[in-house]
């Protein structure tokens, strides 16, 4: 049943040789890895206007120079990450760059920031998309969290089916969103230039002095507008997912994403200024622009529909980049090794599943209202932005390749602007982003704890010249609850392993104890029976004390100790709950006894 459902949802397993077929073309990669960045167009301009609106609508013209500043940062980031892609074609992005050029701790800070950011990406994007759905269908408002969880599971399953297949499905809505917004911008600009739009009374021309405007407020608006740049780094983390040559294809995809993002963001910002659009609590800026441009007709609803869809699909960037980044960290032993294992469909399925359930936990904890996580989301991006650009500067200074000064200037510009935005975010939104100062050290400490564990394990597993202690034999202990054919087979097998076999029975009743001893004598199997009476009906405690005694004597004689458990394997799985799980309790207890071997002898029921 389980396997049938798994095959239906995820598909048939793929051979390792088919890994090349799961690689992404540039167009598929653009849809898979750029959905987060492109979706930010839906709210980037609005975030700027919300800050400017605290002064007055007359300040809206500042959105144009602020947008220019955002575009300059976008250009710096695209050029910088293009250099990272060619310098580190194995992927890893900010984590690898920071670790190799700035040191272990900066690398882990960058990697940890991105891991947390991808979890936030999924939670925030899905919640935003769910908001759009429940706004269109108010009757579903009470089911906000279940809908969000369902959407996370759908995208998780699509990614478990493999990169290529999920990209083929998700490409359509992403490109539909791009085309719809390009049409909106083109028609809107045409109407502006031909005077078909009536500008509101509060509309002011560029350069008009505005009372009360401050540098602090403009910087705050700029940092809010930089939310449009979230997701730019995803391509550099997932270079191995591209078809050959991966670095060149990734660089071209990054350039395509940058061009599209610049056109869409600047187009929406210009239209918002030209139309005099003011942010409203019950209607988005994009919705107002579409309504003003087309009226409430079919195309308006198409734009609203694809905008809602792209907000949901923005989560897919996290599902594409998180597993690859987790693989890089796990390969360096900073995360559990399970993140290096490919699943049935050749994706890093453990990373995909972990991300899905971590984001579901966030959605449940915040009741689906994750808007106040957006500043954390932005900080989580600009920390690795700053570290990776600084790391690249150090790389060029150390190596001094041909043309290194120009390359260093590009990365220096990116590092400086990213650091400025990060500083502005901390200064202007400290009351929201302060948790970063707590959870990032915790994440880094967790990385070190995992690394220390693997290092300690490696030291203990290393073969040394010292000869191991000679073992003269083994004492095999067989716990028995009754005189059955299962016990007979277990005793017979134990005797094939050693001459030193002891059967142990824990009794709660004196009369039953005597009856059991009598039946054991009748078997005449030549194996000594030890009966342990438990006055307090504890199975584990008397057995544990007996083992301590046997273990102490065995050590003196240079004997090892093995406990052999007979185990029932029922024909139907649900039958298992009908049987006493005492053997399981004893086994769990023995796992922590380092000098005792534990073995299980299964007995399969036929009916």
Swiss-Prot record:
UniProt activity-regulation remark: Potassium uptake increases at lower external pH and is abolished by the proton ionophore carbonyl cyanide m-chlorophenylhydrazone (CCCP). Binds cyclic di-AMP (c-di-AMP), which inhibits the potassium transport activity.
Result when mutating residue 36 to A/N: Abolishes potassium uptake
UniProt keyword terms in alphabetical order: Cell membrane, Ion transport, Membrane, Metal-binding, Potassium, Potassium transport, Symport, Transmembrane, Transmembrane helix, Transport
GO terms for biological process, alphabetical: potassium ion transport
Membrane-topology annotation of the record: Multi-pass membrane protein
Binding partners and assembly: Homodimer.
PANTHER family hit by this protein: POTASSIUM TRANSPORTER KIMA (PTHR47704:SF1)
Protein name per UniProt: Potassium transporter KimA
Organism, scientific name: Bacillus subtilis (strain 168)
């Amino acid at each position: 049943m389980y396997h049938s459902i798994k095959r239906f949802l995820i598909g048939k397993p793929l051979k390792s040789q088919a890994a090349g077929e799961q690689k992404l073309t540039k167009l598929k990669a653009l849809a898979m890895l750029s959905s987060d960045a492109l979706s930010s167009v839906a709210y980037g301009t609005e975030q700027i206007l919300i800050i400017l609106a605290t002064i007055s609508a007359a300040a809206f013209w500042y959105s144009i120079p602020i947008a220019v500043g955002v575009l300059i940062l976008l250009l710096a980031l695209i050029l910088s990450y293009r250099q990272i892609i060619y310098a580190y074609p194995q992927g890893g992005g900010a984590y690898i760059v920071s670790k190799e050029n700035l040191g272990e701790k900066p690398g882990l800070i960058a990697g940890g920031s991105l891991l947390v950011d991808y979890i936030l990406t999924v939670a925030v994007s899905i919640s935003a998309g769910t908001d759009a759905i429940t706004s269109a269908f108010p009757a579903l408002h009470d089911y906000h969290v279940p809908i969000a969880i369902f959407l996370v599971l759908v995208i998780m399953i699509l990614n478990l089916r493999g990169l290529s297949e999920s990209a083929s499905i998700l490409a359509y809505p992403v490109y539909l969103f791009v085309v719809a917004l390009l049409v909106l911008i083109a028609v809107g600009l045409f109407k502006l230039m031909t005077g078909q739009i009536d500008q509101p009374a509060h509309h002011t021309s560029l350069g008009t002095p505005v009372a009360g405007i401050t540098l602090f407020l403009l910087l705050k608006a700029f940092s809010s507008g930089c939310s449009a740049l979230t997701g730019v780094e995803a391509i550099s983390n997932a270079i191995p997912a591209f078809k050959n040559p991966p670095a060149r294809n990734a660089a071209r995809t990054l350039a395509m994403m940058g061009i599209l993002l610049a056109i869409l963001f600047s187009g929406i910002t210009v239209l918002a200024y030209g139309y005099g659009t003011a942010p409203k609590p019950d209607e988005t800026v994009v919705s107002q622009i579409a309504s003003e441009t087309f009226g409430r007709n079919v195309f308006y609803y198409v734009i609203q529909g694809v905008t809602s869809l792209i907000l949901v699909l923005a989560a897919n960037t996290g599902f594409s980049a998180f597993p690859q980044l987790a693989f890089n960290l796990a390969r360096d032993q900073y995360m559990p090794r399970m993140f290096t294992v490919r699943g049935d469909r050749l994706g890093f399925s453990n990373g995909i599943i972990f991300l899905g359930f971590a984001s579901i936990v966030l959605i449940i904890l915040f009741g689906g209202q994750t808007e106040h996580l957006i500043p954390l989301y932005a900080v989580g991006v600009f920390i690795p932005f700053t570290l990776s650009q600084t790391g690249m500067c150090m790389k060029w200074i150390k190596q001094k390749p041909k043309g290194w000064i120009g390359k260093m200037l590009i990365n220096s510009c990116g590092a400086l602007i990213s650091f400025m935005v990060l500083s502005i975010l901390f200064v202007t939104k400290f009351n929201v982003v302060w948790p970063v100062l707590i959870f990032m050290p915790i994440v880094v400490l967790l990385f070190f704890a995992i690394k220390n564990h693997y290092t300690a394990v490696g030291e203990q597993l290393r073969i040394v010249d010292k000869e191991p202690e000679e073992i003269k034999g083994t004492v095999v202990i067989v716990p028995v609850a009754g005189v059955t054919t299962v016990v007979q087979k277990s005793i017979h097998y134990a005797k094939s392993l050693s001459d030193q076999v002891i059967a142990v029975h824990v009794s709660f009743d004196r009369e039953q104890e005597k009856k059991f001893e009598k039946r054991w004598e009748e078997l005449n199997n030549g194996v000594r029976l030890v009966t342990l009476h438990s006055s307090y009906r504890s199975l584990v405690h008397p057995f544990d004390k007996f083992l301590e005694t046997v273990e102490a004597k065995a050590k003196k004689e240079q004997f090892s100790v093995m406990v052999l458990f007979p185990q029932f394997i029922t024909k139907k799985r649900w039958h298992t709950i009908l049987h006493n799980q005492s053997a399981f309790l004893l086994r769990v207890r023995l796992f922590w006894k380092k000098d005792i071997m534990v073995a299980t002898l299964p007995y399969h029921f036929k009916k």
